[in-house]
């Protein structure tokens, strides 16, 4: 092998959802990238629930897509049941979700990775990082060492190890080292990282037993078909991308189920003290649900197919680490599961994660230059959260190599910005998942406008290819044309258009009204307006029609939110120099100094969001920073 085989611009460790998006983003941004994975066959594997999207999560997927990422396109190629959640609510909280064929999804991701220029995949476990210990400057990463002793060099490394760092699986009182069921953990790498100046703790997640769907009685369950018409996930997608569609099903646990669980709690590693890591609040185990909601006589279970050509189903709602004999009993006590055959046991897995307050907004570690962390190792849970972080880390790893400034969206620009800001400012003591409620500017951060918010920035940074840019530009131009067409038309009580509106829509035009403003009426939308002969048929692109309608219907709310953002931005981006001496700010309490020293915010906006930070402390900081700026100018 030539020396060039071992030298890259960026090395990505891990081929999961964070790792694949990181490697793809790095390569799209122009960096020669190496993706190292334990097993090439599991690149893009869905380790837990075979689903993409959902409340808050779908927003992240759309943002990944707007920046040229792979997740949405793979979901379109693999989605076998599609739903728009919160469809009856406002556009800010509507979310796209698909049940995916896990084999089709993995194949789609692997094909995208294989086709990406400047990206090389190599199968190897990483045992250590090569780190240059600086004397006059900070430590910096120089490469990695694999389990077989190979040394790969790169000035940027992205670590996306998922649950593999010192991973430990629990089933009852049985426990053993693993990265996930059937895969070895990254034990040596975890030990090496604990020797470095990182704050490391343990988290836990879990998964339910898998069931042979042919052994279930669907006659006693409720059918849950997908939406019609079918949505798509990618802005480049179309319904014809989807494979054959199937239904999911809904059933419930029984009081017998709960009795079985209560009688076996002493054998649960969650309640025996065997598991130390904290699990996800919003995806609790069935043991947790039975204990925490003791008054409930049943819990809902979503019976979700794992694929079109496999018999296995995923019983969403019964994640468990109880002993296998208890799992079998509780499964067979569920409505429709009396004859159920378990194909794989449920289990809990503990793993190492890093305090994300040790990261910059770029996801570069503060302790080691050029080293980026993304995904579950930052304390998050979920494919979508991991993939979004991976894209950001991969992009910034490439920009680090090229000597370009790091990029990270603000809270008012993207859910990705909310995610990163929450992590690096507040940290987390439990697996963090995204919800729309976490975003204070969610009316601005809708699924439908993720491309308008981010594709321009993605194009400037090399993430967006010509085909996506052409599609995006054409869409934006079509929105502008249609908006201009309708805003140029006026209906009055006496003119022909006013009479047409009254006849076609049953709407009285009592005064001169701009046609576009008619959409503001609660009973009207773009589609109904197009029934007016002079106005229709309108545009045939549903995305264009949606943008025209939302921009008009919510213009007042959007304007007020933009004003609010402008006020907040007055000091939001005021930078705080690296290594800033908070002890030198007269008037800051010791408590506030300690909080600031611990988080080391990069700008005033981040400092404001530190728990316990007072307006007075922020004012003192601003005065000190302004005084220092004037001193430098003088």
From Swiss-Prot:
It is found in: Cytoplasm. Its cofactor is FAD. GO terms for molecular function: flavin adenine dinucleotide binding. Keywords: Cytoplasm, FAD, Flavoprotein, NAD, tRNA processing. GO terms for biological process: tRNA methylation; tRNA wobble uridine modification. FAD binds at residues 14-19. One of its GO terms (cellular component) is cytosol. It holds the Pfam family GIDA_C_1st. The keyword Cytoplasm applies. Belongs to the MnmG family. NAD-binding protein involved in the addition of a carboxymethylaminomethyl (cmnm) group at the wobble position (U34) of certain tRNAs, forming tRNA-cmnm(5)s(2)U34. HAMAP family: MnmG_GidA (MF_00129). This is tRNA uridine 5-carboxymethylaminomethyl modification enzyme MnmG. The gene is mnmG.
């Amino acid at each position: 092998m030539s020396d060039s085989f071992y030298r890259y611009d960026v090395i990505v460790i891990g081929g999961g959802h964070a790792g694949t998006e990181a490697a793809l983003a790095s390569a799209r941004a122009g960096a020669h990238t190496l993706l190292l994975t334990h097993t090439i066959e599991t690149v893009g594997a869905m380790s837990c629930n075979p689903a993409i999207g959902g409340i808050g999560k779908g927003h992240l997927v759309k943002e990944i897509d707007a920046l040229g990422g792979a997740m949405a396109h793979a979901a379109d190629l693999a989605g076998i049941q599609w739903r728009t959640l919160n469809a009856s609510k406002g556009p800010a909280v509507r979310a796209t979700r698909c049940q995916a064929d896990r084999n089709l999804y993995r194949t789609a991701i692997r094909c995208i990775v294989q086709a990406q220029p400047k990206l090389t995949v190599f199968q190897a476990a990483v045992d250590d990082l090569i780190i240059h210990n600086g004397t006059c400057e900070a430590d910096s990463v120089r490469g990695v060492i694999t389990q077989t002793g190979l040394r790969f060099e790169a000035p940027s490394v992205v670590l996306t190890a998922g649950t593999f760092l010192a991973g430990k699986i629990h089933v009852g009182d049985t426990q053993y080292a693993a990265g996930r069921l059937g895969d070895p953990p990254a034990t040596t790498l975890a030990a090496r990282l604990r020797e470095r100046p990182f704050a490391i703790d343990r988290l836990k997640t879990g998964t339910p037993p898998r069931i042979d769907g042919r052994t279930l009685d669907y006659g006693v369950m409720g059918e849950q078909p997908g939406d019609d018409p079918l949505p798509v996930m990618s802005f480049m997608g179309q319904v014809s991308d989807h494979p054959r569609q199937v239904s999911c099903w809904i059933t419930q646990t029984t009081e017998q189920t709960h009795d079985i669980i209560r009688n076996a709690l002493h054998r649960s590693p969650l309640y025996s003290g065997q598991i130390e890591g904290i699990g996800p609040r919003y995806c609790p185990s069935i043991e947790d649900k039975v204990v925490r909601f003791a008054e409930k006589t049943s819990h809902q279970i979503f019976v979700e197919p794992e694929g079109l050509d496999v018999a296995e189903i995923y019983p969403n709602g019964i994640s468990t680490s109880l002993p296998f004999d208890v799992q079998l009993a509780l499964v067979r006590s569920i409505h429709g599961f009396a004859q159920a055959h378990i194909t794989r046991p449920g289990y809990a897995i503990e793993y190492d994660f890093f305090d994300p307050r040790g990261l910059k907004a770029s996801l570069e570690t503060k302790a080691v230059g050029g080293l980026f962390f993304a995904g579950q190792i930052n304390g998050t849970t979920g494919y979508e959260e991991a993939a979004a972080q991976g894209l950001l880390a991969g992009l910034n790893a490439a920009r680090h190599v090229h000597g370009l400034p790091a990029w990270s969206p603000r809270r008012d620009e993207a859910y990705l910005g909310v995610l990163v800001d929450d992590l690096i400012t507040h940290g987390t003591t439990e697996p963090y998942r995204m919800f729309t409620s976490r975003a204070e500017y969610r009316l601005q951060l809708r699924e439908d406008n993720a491309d308008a918010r981010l594709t321009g920035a993605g194009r400037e940074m090399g993430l967006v290819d010509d085909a996506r840019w052409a599609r995006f530009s054409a869409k934006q131009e079509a929105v502008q044309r249609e908006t201009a067409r309708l805003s140029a038309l006026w209906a009055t009580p006496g003119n022909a258009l006013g009479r047409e509106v009254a006849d076609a829509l049953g709407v009285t035009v009592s005064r001169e009204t701009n046609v576009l403003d008619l959409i503001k009426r609660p009973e009207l939308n773009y589609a109904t307006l197009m029934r007016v002969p002079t106005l229709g048929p309108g545009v045939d692109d549903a995305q264009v029609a949606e943008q025209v309608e939302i921009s008009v219907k919510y213009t007042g709310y959007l304007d007020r939110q933009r004003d609010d953002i402008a006020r907040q931005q007055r000091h939001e981006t005021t930078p705080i120099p690296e290594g800033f001496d908070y002890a030198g700010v007269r008037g800051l309490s010791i408590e506030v100094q300690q909080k600031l020293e611990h988080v080391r915010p990069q700008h005033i906006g981040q400092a404001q969001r530190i728990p316990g930070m007072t307006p007075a402390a922020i004012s003192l900081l601003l005065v000190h920073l302004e005084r220092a700026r004037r001193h430098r100018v003088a």
